Amino acid sequence: ELLSRIRQLVGPAMPIVASLDLHANVTQRMLAQSDALVSYRTYPHIDMADTGELAAQLMQRRLKLGRKEPMFSRRFPFLISLNAQSTWMAPAKSAYEQLLALDRESGVMLSFCMGFPASDFEECGPVVWGHGPQAEAVVEQLFKAVSEPSVWRPHWLPARDAVVRSEEH
């Protein structure tokens, strides 16, 4: 809604680039109303300044090109528990390592929002997207690498085992 209202105010010629929380539920409307979006790549969120730099790079690319860069996105057909979203451990850690490697290799600016699963609306859930000439191929590559549902299922210890384990440490 916010990006749509900004777009209404500034018109189609004014570039709009925004940064998003890693847990954002990214909608097709958000992608359509902006010239570019980039998400945080860490949870806990320790990359605010880095994400601002990425947004500035996207704006610079947009201004240099004189139009919106090609963008492609893929939505996951499942939700990711918040407990599986920490980028300090698997599976999110390896997902973002793959994102960074593809980002560097391809020049496509990639983002992966894992979504906020407690939201209740149709477009709630994880989305990967990218900006750049090879966006479709690179997004498809990342999507295939990180979209296996079984990888994202958190492992829960039974209560008794959790107590025993906590006493050991």
Language-model segments: which ranges?
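Active-site histidine-anchored catalytic micro-motif
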Residues: 1-65
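Catalytic cores of large soluble enzymes that bind and process phosphate-bearing ligands
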Residues: 43-51, 83-91, 120, 131-138
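C-terminal accessory domains and tails appended to enzymatic cores
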Residues: 92-161
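Short acidic (Asp/Glu) and glycine-rich catalytic loops that position anionic groups and cofactors
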Residues: 34-38, 74-78, 121-126
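Extended redox/cofactor-interaction regions of prokaryotic respiratory oxidoreductases
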Residues: 165
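Conserved small/polar residues in nucleotide/adenosyl-binding loops
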Residues: 168-169
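Short, structured patches in soluble enzyme cores that scaffold and shape functional sites
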Residues: 20, 38-42, 75-80, 132
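Conserved anion/nucleotide-ligand pocket segment
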Residues: 52-56, 60-104
